Amino acid sequence: MKLTLRVWRQKNADAPGTMSTYEVDGISQDMSFLEMLDTLNEELILAGDDPVAFDHDCREGICGACSLVINGDAHGPERTTTCQLHMRSFEDGDTIDIEPWRASAFPVVKDLVVDRSAFDRIIQAGGYISAPTGTAPEAHAAPVPKPDADFAFEHAECIGCGACVAACPNGSAMLFTSAKINHLNVLPQGAPERETRVLDMVGQMDSEGFGGCTLTGECATACPKGIPLPSISAMNKEWLRATRKVRR
Amino acid sequence: MTRTLWDSSLGKKTVMAVSGLIMLLYLVVHMIGNLKIFFGSGEFNHYAHWLRTMGEPFLHYEWALWIVRVVLVAAVVLHAVSAYQLSRRDIRARPAKYVHRKPRASYATRTMRWGGIILGLFIVWHILDLTTGTVHPGGFQSGHPYQNVIDTFSTWYGNTIYIVAMLALGLHVQHGFWSAAQTLGAGSATRDRVLKTIANALAAVLTLGFICVPVAVMTGVVS
């Protein structure tokens, strides 16, 4: 396959960026999208140019490191992570636009790499449970009803990649935050911090400068792990419940 | 708790949802009242007069009407202020646009902000036209709403403004009702289909219910 790539190049956080055009040849349909970028970078390095910086880690679709907006879609045309996207999803001769996640809470570090530490701070605000130290407790000590376990698991699938924020026209992190809150709030292990968790995590989300939800549904469409849109409504319900319960 | 609500984006959205639902409830009542025009000037004018005497003798003349007006003005102001502040926040959160753009979301979703502004302007015109009579075409007669309605819908601009605004209303209600339900925590995988159906039905019924009045005047069904 021969492709034309238009890639966002930006030297650092303060430098202005621009779309640069590159030609790549000899791309196999079985390559992943990241392997295709590796091929481009090898050519750039041989030519003495600066390789394109992009985030990646496990390349197995479970770490949440990869993060590209491909032809206007977060993680590209398939509903998966960029590392699991293969070149068979494209045609020979295609022009592909590659851009970083766009949100003021995710500033560009270099080229296609953005700083997603805002998500870490949201987790630090309440995305944990109070657990006693020592040996692991008996697994059956805290019974969990099957529907609750399923609900928790569905939301625990979130890998924190940030595609929801990238896809949202308001740069909102509500799908991410709701996945993390719902995952723990439905379980008995998460009960001690149920109210403070939702209030603190939503508070942190607001102060990081993420936008609000206008129910466009773009986040749930882009999510490689299929976190559903009603998650946000479940979080709103938890938040309203917590504001009634907690006096601060 | 008031502080928690107003300082949080979720709290402001709650304010928007509740004030929106109050206005929506009013609109349903308003539309049903409007339809009385099809039963002739006697019934319509009698109904309009009852709006002023409702609640008597417990409430004084027009007190109930003024209570409704105060609640509605509060709802409009809260709705508009939170919409403005939330929109500012949303625009700040996404300053850089993608080079590769795709048309996304439904028309109703994309037109919520401009649609809201159109509706705000419409409300001002509507009150100046049929409540105070300031911009009413022909002589505004206080206490003769049937004749006033026919005057307004006998002008091309009266019909145009009204019908455009009612189409905007339908779009606004379609996305707004659904969003309000989600904001108040009513959404779930099983309930979302029902909520969307209710939103679509409310939007269609309100739009058609309001628009049939100018259409009836234009076609001479009501004269």
Regions of interest found by a model, annotated:
Chain A
Residues 1-23:
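Eukaryote-biased recognition of intrinsically disordered, low-complexity regulatory segments
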Residues 3, 20, 64, 94-96, ...:
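Structural beta-strand/beta-sheet cores of well-ordered domains, especially the beta-sheet scaffolds
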Residues 8-10, 24-27, 57-59, 71:
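Acidic/polar N-terminal loop/beta-strand segments that form early-domain functional surfaces
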Residues 20-32:
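Short, contiguous acidic and Ser/Thr-rich linear segments
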Residues 31-50, 96-248:
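Ferredoxin-type iron-sulfur electron-transfer modules in oxidoreductases and energy-metabolism complexes
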Residues 40-73:
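A basic, amphipathic helix-loop patch mediating RNA/tRNA/ribosome contacts
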Residues 63-118:
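A generic, well-ordered mixed alpha/beta core segment in the N-terminal half of proteins
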